[in-house]
């Protein structure tokens, strides 16, 4: 999928703005980042074979700021945390509409010195999965709990709206796939609320997240 030139102009601006931010403003959990060089590409064929997946290069040309990322030790993950984006109701269905939402999330995270979008995967209203931050890097989605923590966000505000059936189905499939890929122990799937002072992932999603730990 190719974005319109105006989108890429805007993305280029965000990239330049992120690079211009002073190092003193980098979040503590990203300050020790050591990820120079090209962004590693992880093999996600095990996901693409099972469900709709859009790779990162399909929705944005903005590259991460590697100096602000932390390389995942041997790509090992021991837990999964589920989120909602929280700030607005989202029912975007077309890929173009979803890309605009993803642009907003990415731009916000760059302005916060995350070095890239903080989540590893994003699930839209139709159940499509979008690759966010490479799994080669620890995420930036739960303050103080990002190491070995794989981050998945569902687009929407689930204090104010209910997740779609397609989103919930995709959440179940995706968590199952990554849990088995990384041998994440049963009982190690959390809502953001379990790890921090927040309502995320919202009252309409959190009970569904809790049930994930009961699945094989």
Residue ranges and their predicted role:
Residues 102-106, 110, 116-134, 149-151:
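Cell-envelope/glycan interface and biosynthesis
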Residues 75-110:
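Active-site acidic/histidine clusters and adjacent loop/turn architecture
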């Amino acid at each position: 999928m190719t974005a319109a030139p105006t989108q890429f102009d805007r993305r280029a601006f965000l990239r330049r703005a992120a690079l211009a931010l002073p190092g003193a403003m980098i979040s503590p959990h990203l300050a020790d980042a050591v990820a120079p060089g090209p962004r590693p590409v992880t093999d996600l064929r095990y996901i693409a074979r099972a469900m709709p997946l859009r790779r990162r290069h399909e929705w944005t040309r903005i590259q991460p700021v590697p100096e602000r990322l932390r390389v995942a030790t041997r790509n090992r993950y021991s837990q999964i945390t589920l989120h909602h984006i929280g700030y607005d109701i989202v029912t975007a269905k077309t890929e173009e509409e979803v890309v605009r939402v993803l642009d907003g999330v990415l731009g916000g995270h760059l302005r916060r010195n995350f070095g890239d979008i903080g989540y590893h995967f994003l699930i839209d209203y139709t159940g499509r999965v979008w690759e966010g931050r490479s799994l080669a890097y620890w995420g930036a989605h739960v303050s103080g709990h990002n190491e070995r923590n794989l981050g998945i966000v569902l687009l929407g505000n689930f204090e104010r709206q209910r997740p779609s059936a397609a989103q919930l189905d995709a959440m179940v499939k995706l968590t199952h796939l990554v849990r088995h890929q990384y041998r994440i122990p049963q009982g190690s799937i959390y809502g953001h609320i379990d790890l921090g002072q927040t309502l995320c992932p919202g009252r309409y999603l959190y009970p569904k997240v809790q049930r994930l730990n009961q699945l094989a």
